[in-house]
Curated annotation (Swiss-Prot):
This is Carbamoyl phosphate synthase large chain. It is an enzyme of class 6 (ligase). Mg(2+) 1 binds at Q285, E299. Residues 957-1102 form the MGS-like domain. It comes from Beutenbergia cavernae (strain ATCC BAA-8 / DSM 12333 / CCUG 43141 / JCM 11478 / NBRC 16432 / NCIMB 13614 / HKI 0122). Residues 549-956 are annotated as: Carbamoyl phosphate synthetic domain. The gene is carB.
Length: 1109
């Protein structure tokens, strides 16, 4: 059946901001879908609040709405655009839940909009735990014994039948949010309480414990003719109990017998048919008892999921693209396989390699969080690797994680028996580093039986780790490194650095020996069919195998180094810039993407001309360069777009003779080295906050005394404010050094392993961010962003406004001339990000980064200027004048905005509700100089209040328009809150406050109701504390600023209760003032919606009138 002719326009809902459990994989899925639907001649309308996505680039849809994904806003877009159909299966749980809400509100029926890709009945059957249990029974399969509950009373009743431990799973949530394993009644009350709260249907499933069972997933697709394909089987290395997003996973499943696999396949096909998914894909999770082989079906996602992205990249089978075609009427046998060009999508992929995915965590950003891995997903990113065997793929994936301690190591002596026993004991608890603990225990002599008993990891996987230990033993035992043993190590994934560690040699020496033996990796191709048909798409992975499959080429190649796994501080924003470079340089150059993140658009096989799915280490990049050099000229390597990961390789790559494009490595070092950068600022006459560099505690104290407290301390060469703190006195400085600074040298006089930077902290300064382009002669200023929060909160966590609202024309001119002086002094070619602080009319330079920043996509969306594309063309040799002439850049840059320009607000999205302390409470929500946000949204409207209100709706579900607001602020903030509180009273809000804040408000004539602090306990007549009121849902918004660095217990209790209750929490006075303006904007009426294309047309109209935009 060809495409349906009754559909002319489709609304696609994206997934919104990057959050734990719903990340960049949905940008990849949505981008593919939008591309396909437009190829089919359909008008595509897209709504997504995340400006850092490729899918929100105006060329991917006919009407692109960067608006909050709420039922009310999407209903406004439907009323305006009148689409024929709504496709909700490519935007994660957010899109699915929004579609259900629109259906239940009657909006889809009112505007005659058909749901495609999934029907409401199928969504309910798959997502509603009780109904899905019935589906499984009708298919002749088993679920775990379970009960459904809607209240805590029902939960406790179910526990009496099921016993402990038991698993709590809420309906209609993603990433395991609100789920957990309860070992007793106290656990159960806490976990089930959260689960009922987070489930939109206030429903949880309580099921018998299947902890320790083996966990598998099948990725399936079905069309309207009932053709079903199993795209991929995935096996979790960790047993049931760890969320699949937090487990190391393997494709294809390796420890199933053929009979077991066929059983899972039969059940999976029966379930997809019974649920009724007939125009798309789904993911089904299974548990298998390791001894009896009993199979239970855990759950199903009736949509494109995180696993779909992994399965797509693992097999080369583009699930999202095919799902979009199925949704508009095609059948699987009518859709061609892009990679072979000669087989249809109804041919199931076959793998002749092994794929391993390893998650990346960010517990270091949340020191109070419990590092235990459970059924609630906590990882912030992932890396994937391909190899000819499991050990090769595993070791490549572990080094792709790009984090200290994430790889197997053989440093020093093997652990003694006592330490080995401790390692085995520690491995009983699933944590981020469990596999490394197992490997170290094997070094110390632990047996396979001991480790299986401790971890319940399948013996086959454990045996593979013993195999690695054998290879390491052979490496250590030989007198000299011969070709045979070195080739054996490389076939098992050992890096040159690991071999060097085992042999006590330098990494460069090992590389020289390896090259002398002619030992280099070859590059195989992902072809979906185990070499049965010829592959037309160059999607490569390395292996120490026989023959390479890299084809000769005529055009010069450009290597673009991606950003690796998402992490806090280096996320999808950097992938965005890499994709833009690939798109801009295609044609004149052969674009070659090197990356290892399966979630992203950059690792789609048709983004660049060639894709190498490889770790971003010096060794791996060097080998890709050599492979490409062997088949044609290489013009250059781009390192400035992928964040700190590729940037940190720049100097070593240049020293090895590789042609680095754009800003040279010595200029990158000049911006990072405080001494050299200080000289650039002095030469340009630009002030910076007083600073110093220390390599010991004594030096650190002397520097802090000289420049005066408070000071900002941090290690050098970090991204995302890693390890950065504001320190108020010498005791805190000493504590910081002991906690956060690795040291070398003798115990009585330790020396820091790398210098610590100490800056004077500017209190009450306005922080400003600038993104600009420089070609060596001319500056193009992309945009000036003014932060809503004052300096001291990491720029990645602060809300910011473009164009700036309180900066004068004179101040903006100073910002422009200062940016140009820095670009010239450092020697930038390409992108530059500068952060300034304006304090007492002095413009201080905080830092400069000669690379793509995380604000580049936001500036591009707000101004319509593709900065990353322009930067890549500058690196290729163009000038800013050339780019203006070719239309890549407008005639006038973004220094000054037209008075009628709309306002864009970027808001950070923080993952606090995912992280709980060991006591079970949410971690503290206070912001500081270390970045903690996982993603961002954009609010776009005619003025700041409306844009800010949209940003809050997009990030956190919105601001209240009536009800109760609780206010308790530090003494220094009490004067600042008077006017915003007075305005809330005028708007009809009831104000609750603690005694101190209430006294100040009373003196200003503002009535408030005094409530008890948590530390006061309940009153003599049972009066509730503020935490009780928040938990009971009786407070609609909380304003609480932290009280210096002293005792924070009350504030902590208030903030964590607010986060757990899912209510808006404001922790700075500037944010409070903006929130009050936002509340007023909401009360004036529903949000107006406008597409980026409409904004671009208005901007063009202003320019043709002779007034710059």
């Amino acid at each position: 059946m060809p495409r349906r002719t009754d559909l002319t326009s489709v609304l696609v809902i994206g997934s919104g901001p990057i959050v734990i459990g719903q990340a960049a994989e949905f940008d990849y899925s949505g981008t593919q879908a939008c591309r396909v639907l437009r190829e089919e001649g359909l008008r595509v309308i897209l709504v997504n609040s995340n400006p850092a996505t490729i899918m929100t680039d105006p060329e991917f849809a006919d009407a692109t709405y960067v608006e909050p994904i709420t039922p009310e806003v999407v209903a406004s877009i439907i009323a305006k655009e009148r689409p024929d159909a709504l496709l909700p299966t490519l935007g994660g749980q957010t899109a699915l839940n929004t579609a259900i809400a629109l259906h239940e509100a009657g909006v889809l029926a009112e505007y005659d909009v058909e749901l495609i890709g999934a029907n409401i009945e199928a969504i309910h059957l798959a997502e509603d735990r009780d109904q899905f249990k019935g589906v499984v029974e009708r298919c002749g399969a088993e679920s775990a014994r379970s009960h459904i509950a809607h209240t805590i009373e029902e939960v406790l009743e179910a526990a009496r039948d099921l016993g402990y431990p038991l698993v709590v799973r809420p309906s209609f949530t993603m990433g395991g949010l609100g789920s957990g394993i309860a070992y007793d009644e106290a656990d159960l009350r806490r976990i089930a309480g959260a689960g009922l709260h987070y489930s939109p249907t206030t429903e949880v499933l309580l099921e018998e414990s299947i902890l320790g069972w083996k966990e598998y997933e099948l990725e399936l697709m079905r069309d309207r003719n009932d053709n079903v394909v199993v795209v991929c089987s995935i096996e979790n290395v960790d047993p049931v109990g760890v969320h699949t997003g937090d487990s190391i996973t393997v494709a294809p499943a390796l420890t199933l017998t053929d009979r077991e696999y066929q059983r899972l396949r039969d059940v999976g096909i029966a379930v997809i048919r019974e649920v009724g998914v007939d125009t798309g894909g789904c993911n089904i999770q299974f548990a298998v008892h390791p001894d009896t082989g009993r199979v239970v079906v855990i759950e199903m996602n009736p949509r494109v999921s995180r696993s779909s992205a992994l399965a797509s990249k693992a097999t080369g089978f583009p699930i999202a693209k095919i799902a979009a075609r199925l949704a508009v009427g095609y059948t699987l046998d009518e859709i061609p396989n892009d990679i072979t060009g000669s087989t249809p999508a109804s041919f199931e992929p076959t793998l002749d390699y092994v794929v391993v995915k390893v998650p990346r965590f960010a517990f270091e950003k949340f020191p109070a969080a419990d590092p235990l891995l459970t059924t609630t997903m906590k990882s912030v990113g992932e890396a994937m690797a391909l190899g000819r065997n499991f050990t090769e793929a595993l070791q490549k994936a572990m080094r792709s994680i790009d984090k200290a301690g994430s790889t197997f190591h053989w440093r020093g002596q093997a652990p003694d028996p006592e330490r080995t026993a401790a390692l085995v004991d520690a491995a009983r608890t699933p944590t981020e580093g469990r596999l490394v603990q197992v490997q170290q225990a094997i070094r110390g002599g632990a047996t396979l039986e001991e480790l299986f008993e401790a971890t319940a990891i399948d013996p086959w996987f454990l045996d593979q780790l013993f195999l690695l230990e054998e290879v390491a033993g052979r490496l250590a035992a030989v007198d000299a490194l011969d070709a045979g043993v070195l080739a054996l190590a490389k076939r098992h994934g050992f890096s040159d650095a690991q071999v060097a560690e085992i042999r006590d040699l330098g990494e460069a020496t090992v590389r020289e020996i390896r090259h002398a033996y002619g030992l280099r990796p070859v590059y195989k191709t992902v072809d979906t069919c185990a070499a049965e048909f010829e592959a037309r798409t160059p999607y490569h992975y390395s292996s120490y195998d026989a023959e390479t499959e890299v084809q000769p080429r005529d055009r010069p190649a450009v290597l673009i180094l991606g950003s690796g796994p998402n992490r806090i501080g280096q996320g999808i924003e950097f992938d965005y810039s890499c994709v833009h470079a690939a798109l801009a340089l295609k044609g004149e150059y052969e674009t070659v993407m090197v990356n290892c993140n399966p979630e992203t658009v950059s690792t789609d096989y048709d983004t660049a001309d060639r894709l190498y799915f490889e770790p971003l280490t010096f060794e791996d990049v060097l080998e890709v360069y050599h492979a490409e050099l062997a088949v044609g000229p290489v013009a250059g390597i781009i390192v400035q777009l992928g964040g700190q990961t590729p940037l940190s390789l720049a100097t070593r790559l240049a020293d090895a003779g590789l042609p680095i494009w754009g800003t040279p490595p010595e200029a990158i070092d000049a911006a990072e080295d405080r001494g050299v950068f200080g000289e650039v600022l002095v030469a340009a006459g630009l002030p910076a906050p007083a600073f110093g560099t220390a390599t010991s505690l004594a030096q650190a104290r002397a520097v802090a005394d000289r420049i005066g407290y408070p000071v900002l301390v941090r290690p050098s060469y970090v991204l995302g404010g890693r390890g950065m703190e504001i320190v108020y006195d010498v005791e805190q400085l000493t504590d910081y050094v002991r906690r956060a600074t690795p040291t070398d040298g003798p115990a009585d006089a330790p020396v820091f392993a790398s210098p610590v930077l100490i800056d004077r902290f500017l209190d009450e300064a306005i922080e400003i961010d600038v993104d600009a382009l420089y070609d060596g002669h001319e500056l193009f200023l992309g945009g000036v962003m003014e932060h809503i929060e004052e300096a001291g909160i990491h720029s990645g966590d602060s809300a910011c406004v473009l164009p700036p609202v309180t900066l004068s024309r004179r101040e903006i001119e100073r910002i422009r001339t200062s940016t140009e002086a820095i670009a010239r002094g450092v020697g930038v070619r390409g992108l530059l990000n500068v952060q300034f602080a304006l304090s007492s009319d002095v413009l201080y330079v905080l830092e400069a980064n000669p690379r793509a920043s995380r604000t580049v996509p936001f500036v591009a969306k707000a101004t319509g200027v593709p900065l990353a594309k322009a930067a890549s063309l500058l690196m290729a040799g163009a000038t800013i004048a050339d780019l203006r002439a070719s239309g890549h850049l407008p005639a006038v840059d973004g220094t000054y905005a037209h008075p009628s320009s709309p306002v864009a607000v970027k808001e950070a999205v923080l993952p606090f509700k995912r992280f709980r302390t060991r006591a079970g409470t949410v971690v503290d929500t206070v912001l500081g100089p270390e970045m903690r946000s996982t993603g961002e949204v954009m609010g776009y409207d005619v003025d700041v209040p409306a844009a800010f209100a949209k940003s809050q709706a997009a990030a956190y579900g919105g601001l209240p328009t009536s009800g109760r607001v609780f206010v308790s602020v530090a003494d220094r903030d009490k004067r600042s809150i008077v006017f915003p509180v007075a305005r809330l009273v005028e708007l009809g809000f009831e104000i609750l406050a603690t005694t101190g804040t209430a006294d100040v408000l009373r003196r200003y004539g503002i009535d408030s109701r005094v409530v008890r602090k948590a530390s006061d306990g309940r009153g003599p007549d049972g009066e509730l504390t503020v935490v009780d009121l928040i938990t009971a849902g009786e407070i609609d918004m909380v304003v609480n600023t932290p009280n210096g660095q002293g005792a924070r217990a009350d504030g902590y209790d208030i903030r964590t209760a607010t986060t757990a209750a899912d209510k808006p929490i404001v922790t700075t006075t500037q944010q409070f003032a903006a929130a009050v303006l936002g509340i007023e904007a909401i009360r004036r009426g529903p949000f107006a919606v406008a597409s980026l294309q409409e904004h671009d047309a208005a901007r063009a109209a202003r320019e043709t009138e002779g007034v710059h935009a």
